[in-house]
């Protein structure tokens, strides 16, 4: 059984851009809780690369390097999400010799 999307259930479903719950409970300034759409001018409502309803600029570090083989990830300026965690390619030494 497939049910239609329900605005106000905290799940972003087909046709929704955001879902912060019922209007009386919504604490998200970027989301219109009545329509489950972003407010005018907003690019995003949540994510490591979303700040005050806008994408953070390209180059903002969203996941710092955690080891010598890890590579720091930065926002792209085009998405609210931090890119996939990346590491140095196989065969490259990560040790200080």
From Swiss-Prot:
Q: In which tissues is it expressed?
A: Expressed by the venom gland.
Where is the motif (D/ECD-tripeptide)? 68-70
Primary location: secreted
Cofactor annotation remark:
Binds 1 zinc ion per subunit.
The UniProt record lists the Disintegrin domain at 4-90
What EC number(s) has UniProt assigned to this enzyme? Answer: 3.4.24.-
UniProt KW keywords: Calcium, Cell adhesion impairing toxin, Disulfide bond, Glycoprotein, Hemostasis impairing toxin, Hydrolase, Metal-binding, Metalloprotease, Platelet aggregation inhibiting toxin, Protease, Secreted, Toxin, Zinc, Zymogen
MF term (GO), any: metallopeptidase activity
Q: Which residue ranges traverse the bilayer? A: none
Keyword check for Zinc, yes or no: yes
- Quote any Pfam family the record assigns: Disintegrin
Q: Name one GO biological process term.
A: proteolysis
Localized where? Secreted
**To which protein family does this belong?**
Belongs to the venom metalloproteinase (M12B) family. P-III subfamily. P-IIIa sub-subfamily.
Q: What does this protein do?
A: The hemorrhagic metalloproteinase-disintegrin-like bothrojarin-1 is a potent inhibitor of collagen-induced platelet aggregation by blockage of alpha-2/beta-1 (ITGA2/ITGB1) integrin. It does not present any fibrinogen-clotting activity.
- Which protein are we looking at? Zinc metalloproteinase-disintegrin-like bothrojarin-4
Q: Which organism is it from?
A: Bothrops jararaca (Jararaca)
Organism ancestry: Eukaryota, Metazoa, Chordata, Craniata, Vertebrata
């Amino acid at each position: 059984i497939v049910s239609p999307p329900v605005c106000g259930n905290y799940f972003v479903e087909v046709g929704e851009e955001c879902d912060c719950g019922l209007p009386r409970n919504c604490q998200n300034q970027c989301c219109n809780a009545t329509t489950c759409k972003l407010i005018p001018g907003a690019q995003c409502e949540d994510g490591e690369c979303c700040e005050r309803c806008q994408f953070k600029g390209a180059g903002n570090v969203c996941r710092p390097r955690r080891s010598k083989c890890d590579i720091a990830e930065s926002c792209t300026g085009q998405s609210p999400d931090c890119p996939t965690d990346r590491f140095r390619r196989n065969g490259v030494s990560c040790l200080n010799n």
